[in-house]
From Swiss-Prot:
Family per record: Belongs to the UPF0246 family.
One GO cellular component, as annotated: cytosol
Protein name as annotated: UPF0246 protein CPR_2119
InterPro entries the record matches: YaaA (IPR005583)
Phylogenetic placement of the source organism: Bacteria, Bacillati, Bacillota, Clostridia, Eubacteriales
Amino acid sequence: MIALLSPAKTLDLTKPNLDIETSKPIFISEAEVIMNNLKELEIQDLCPLMKISEDLGVQTFTKIQDWNTIYYGDEKPFVLSFKGEAYRGLDADDFTKEDLEFCNDSLRILSGLYGALKPLDGTKAYRLEMGTKISIDGSKNLYDFWGNKIMDSLLKDLENHKEKVIINLASNEYYKSIKQIDKKVRVITPVFKERKGIEYKVVTVYAKKARGQMVRYITKNRITKSEDLKNFDLYGYEFNERLSEGDTWVFTRD
């Protein structure tokens, strides 16, 4: 069983006091191809492409120019660097070494630049969303560039797991990069809803955080069987069998 998360736009590269070796992303060669294309762009090209302000464009341009493929094994792990809502829910800063090692086996972070990241892959500062409309070496976009590579890597990783199931906690933008995987293995998609009057509705900021909270639940409880996720009860959520349908599992909170 492997869970999926989307990356966050914000990175914190402050190094923690952590004695654990980080790894080089498996698709570093593909990332280098993408970055070599991005290095040819000027700030005035990046801003409309990535839909960012000029200030962010300057920062992004610098990150792109400074990016390289040199790894020393002491970089900050990506799982501790990302700072979006999902990662606030994951709250991996208090993970033990054993927690991080389990998480490294049971979580993959989808990425426009790196394809699929392990939590303990070493961080290099970057900004590139999967939906960015950029052509890389003749490809139509990043989905076209990645093709089936990300999906195939996940299927290979699943070979080492007893239960061949994907827990899809990624956004649609990122899941789209592996959308054919449900024809190969079972994909369970948890959905998190809040009570609004007489109905339950998805509240984006809470839903994003809950995705990370579920990964935390998986990690802290060493969960390897998908059925055990129905016991997820952090922060007031509970499995709602009535609203769930097939492999879309709904968790509600009053």
